[in-house]
């Protein structure tokens, strides 16, 4: 989870030490995806910069295809931007859930598929 306040500047450098391309889509970032959110090939790195203009809770995730599988494998999280003058709370809970829908065996998984057992496991 990334956290900040309205007006904070974020600078995140990602180095891809894996074997396939990856990227990050910061929903809170309001940036042009063609310039800063392109896929990072193995061995490359890219620095993402954005300023938080609005308070709220947004998702960030790998946006390189197969995106749904990257998210289902944990390549996602939350960006929490607090508003000015936020009052203290007694407790705070930060949850994030993901799903992956599988097709027939060896056909992959994506958003166009449906659960094999929609009424339970």
Placement of each model-derived feature along the sequence:
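Histidine- and aromatic-enriched segments that form or immediately flank copper-ligand environments
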Residues: 1-81
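Short, surface-exposed, charged/polar-biased interaction segments
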Residues: 45-47, 83, 100, 116
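Beta-sandwich strand segments
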Residues: 70-73, 87, 108
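Short loop/turn segments at secondary-structure transitions that flank enzyme active sites
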Residues: 30, 68, 85, 101-104
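Low-complexity, Pro/Ser/Thr- and charge-rich linker/hinge segments at domain boundaries
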Residues: 80-96, 104
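Acidic-aromatic/histidine active-site loop/patch
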Residues: 96-121
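A short, polar/charged loop/turn motif at coil->beta-strand junctions and beta-hairpin connectors
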Residues: 18, 89-91, 115-117
């Amino acid at each position: 989870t990334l956290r900040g306040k309205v007006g904070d500047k974020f600078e995140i450098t990602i180095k891809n030490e894996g074997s396939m391309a990856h990227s990050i889509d910061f929903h809170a970032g309001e940036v042009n995806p063609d310039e800063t959110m392109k896929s990072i090939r193995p061995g490359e790195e890219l620095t993402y910069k954005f300023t938080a203009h609005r308070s709220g809770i947004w998702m960030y995730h790998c946006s390189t295809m197969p995106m749904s599988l990257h998210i289902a494998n944990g390549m996602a999280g939350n960006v929490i931007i607090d508003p000015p003058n936020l009052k203290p709370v007694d407790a705070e809970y930060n949850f994030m859930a993901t799903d992956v829908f599988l097709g027939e065996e060896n056909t992959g998984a994506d958003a166009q598929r449906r659960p094999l057992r929609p009424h339970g496991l």
